[in-house]
């Protein structure tokens, strides 16, 4: 069972898709290395196919529980190496497009 933090976002116009994903991966890899996240997945819209106006990239970050997610947020601020790659990634994001969602596996332990 996991909590899944999902972000939809586009990169800024002057940034390539590859640079966007490379910078994002540096940050997310740091969270995994520091045991603050289980894993992640980055996907890109295929052929522009979608039923609503969502940004092009989807980032799914999987956490054991809400405490691990909270710990990931804290290390982003407190660890200089993690903060550096976080800032490096954030400057590539088109902030007008970013959307955040929090999902969980269902049914979870509370629903069984």
Where do the model's predicted regions map?
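Short, well-ordered beta-strand segments in beta-rich or mixed alpha/beta enzyme
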Residues: 3-11, 41-78
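Residue-level signal for secondary-structure boundary sites
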Residues: 15-17, 67-69, 108
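Generic alpha-helical structural signal
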Residues: 21-25, 70, 83
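Short amphipathic alpha-helical segments
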Residues: 15-42
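Short, surface-exposed, polar/charged, turn-prone segments marking secondary-structure boundaries
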Residues: 33-38, 59, 66-72, 86-91, ...
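A common structural junction motif
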Residues: 27-29, 77-85
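Glycine-rich beta-strand-turn "strand-cap" elements at beta-sheet edges
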Residues: 41-55, 81-112
């Amino acid at each position: 069972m996991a909590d899944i933090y999902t972000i939809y976002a586009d990169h800024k116009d002057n940034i390539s898709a590859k640079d966007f994903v490379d910078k994002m991966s540096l940050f997310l890899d740091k969270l995994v290395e520091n045991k603050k996240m289980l894993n992640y997945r980055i996907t890109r819209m295929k052929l522009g196919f979608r039923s609503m106006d969502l940004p092009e990239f989807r980032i799914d970050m999987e956490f054991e529980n809400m405490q691990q997610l909270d710990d990931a947020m804290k290390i982003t601020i407190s660890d200089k190496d993690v903060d550096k790659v976080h800032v490096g990634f954030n400057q590539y994001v088109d902030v007008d497009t970013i959307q955040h969602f929090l999902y969980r596996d269902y049914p979870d332990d509370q629903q069984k």
